[in-house]
């Protein structure tokens, strides 16, 4: 196996994103720092890859360093089944300003097949993500 070494944190992040896209679990494990590995990494990665379709990557910021670096990015994806956050949020008004305080996570909402899809495609759910 001829593996190139990333020259920056950004380059490694981009290559790991590509590995997620093509399902290269070996590379993902190989490029995960040993101190941060867990026994179930392989199974979690396999499940993620099976249930996720990656749509695109946008790097927002890269702060390089000699021994440490950071990369801020957004990865766009669809998951099967799709994920949702259903929350009951609490707010408080102080000094005339509404502020979010906290919230409770609630069970997922079941979507009707005849509702418009959550992705704003203007298609009904049954003809879009509900297939």
Report each predicted region and the residues it spans.
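Cysteine-rich micro-motifs
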Residues: 1, 126-130
């Amino acid at each position: 196996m001829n593996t190139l070494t990333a020259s920056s944190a950004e380059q490694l992040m981009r290559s790991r994103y590509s590995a997620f896209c093509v399902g290269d679990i070996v590379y993902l494990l190989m490029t995960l720092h040993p101190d941060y590995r867990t026994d179930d990494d392989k199974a979690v990665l396999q499940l993620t890859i099976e249930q996720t379709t990656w749509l695109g990557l946008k790097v927002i910021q890269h702060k390089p360093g000699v021994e440490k670096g950071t990369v801020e990015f957004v990865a766009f994806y669809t998951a099967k089944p799709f994920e949702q956050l259903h929350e009951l949020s609490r707010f408080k008004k102080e000094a005339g300003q509404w502020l979010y305080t906290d919230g409770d996570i609630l069970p997922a909402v079941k979507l009707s097949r005849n509702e418009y899809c959550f992705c704003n495609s203007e298609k009904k759910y049954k003809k879009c993500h509900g297939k």
